[in-house]
């Protein structure tokens, strides 16, 4: 299929909304740098990826360490993503794979969790005992897991939903679920170890995969502040900062999103946003600036490369604590 490029923008999304009404400067380049750094580490560890390099100021595809500017484009090996036919919320995965070519996106997100914060959706799907924890009930505090938990959710449906292993295996098609889980656990280990080197705690994240010539290959982007949740000195260093800010300052919109998703499921409507009665408002400039500094300082710390003129991560974290 050849090569393509990911262009990383400063747009962001929370609560599955899609493009929000403003941008976070430097976010795109921060995520591109982190994603490239991780892909190169994965390749060094023997994990296949679709990564081919970043694009420098001359338009050349180079390794991350050879770029002369914070990268905003990543070269990748292309994969097939067929249309997923559906009737309401009934999706035809057999037709999806029938239309696929050799390199096909596995239409799952493989989620890994190292800890379970208060409010995590996992608490509603599993008991502490099922997560190898010695509690009768979930405590009212974050919990570190003795071993990572892997879950599977849909990727291409209008609304994400978590799956049991039987349904996940069906949706995975020709990709073996055990292989997807094994790759996810190895990715989690590498990201967790690198985060710890920079003083960050890696809480959870996800990967997406393609099946390339019969081999599970990591695709999309992995180990960034949008795909994963990290903590530094007790403070979130991820898109979670913005998500929580919207919960605190625009609860009516957050509730409207949840209501629309519930109604869409009950009415068998695929496009839940068409049922949402509110729109999000832009962030204040001060929140945009603080979040921008957090992304850029975090990328500098995680990669060990001073790509961005940003405060230290400790300073950036202090600035977002009270948002």
What are these regions (language model features)?
Residues 3, 105, 199-202, 213-216:
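Coil-to-beta-strand transition motifs
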Residues 233-305:
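C-lobe/activation-segment region of protein kinase-like
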Residues 203, 207-250:
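Catalytic activation segment of kinase domains across protein kinase-like and atypical kinase folds
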């Amino acid at each position: 299929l050849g090569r393509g490029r990911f262009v990383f923008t400063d747009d962001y999304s929370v609560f599955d909304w899609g493009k929000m009404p403003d941008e976070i400067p430097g976010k795109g380049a921060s995520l591109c740098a982190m994603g490239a750094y991780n892909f190169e580490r994965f390749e060094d560890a023997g994990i296949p990826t679709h990564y081919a390099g970043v694009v420098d100021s001359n338009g050349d595809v180079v390794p991350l360490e050879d770029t002369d500017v914070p990268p905003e484009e990543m070269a990748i090996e292309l994969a097939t993503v067929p249309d997923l036919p559906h009737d309401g919320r009934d999706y035809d995965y057999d037709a999806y794979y029938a239309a696929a070519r050799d390199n096909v996106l596995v239409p799952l997100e493989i989620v890994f969790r190292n800890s379970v914060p208060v409010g995590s959706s996992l608490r509603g799907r599993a008991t502490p005992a099922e997560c190898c924890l010695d509690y009768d009930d979930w405590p009212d505090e974050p919990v570190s897991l003795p071993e990572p938990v892997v879950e599977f959710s849909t990727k291409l449906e209008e609304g994400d939903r978590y799956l049991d292993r039987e349904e996940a295996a069906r949706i995975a098609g020709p990709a073996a679920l055990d292989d997807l889980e094994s790759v996810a656990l190895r990715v989690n280990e590498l990201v967790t170890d690198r985060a710890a080197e920079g003083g960050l705690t890696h809480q959870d994240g996800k990967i997406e995969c393609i099946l390339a010539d019969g081999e599970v290959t990591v695709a999309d982007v992995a180990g960034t502040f949008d795909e994963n949740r990290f903590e530094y000195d007790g403070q979130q260093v991820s898109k979670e900062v913005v998500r929580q800010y919207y919960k605190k300052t625009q609860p009516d919109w957050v509730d409207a999103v949840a209501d629309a998703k519930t109604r869409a499921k009950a009415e068998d409507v695929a496009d839940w946003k068409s049922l949402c009665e509110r729109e999000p408002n832009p962030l204040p400039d001060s929140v945009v600036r603080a979040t921008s500094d957090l992304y850029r300082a975090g990328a500098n710390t995680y990669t060990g490369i001073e790509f961005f003129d940003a405060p230290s991560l400790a300073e950036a974290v202090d600035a977002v604590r009270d948002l």
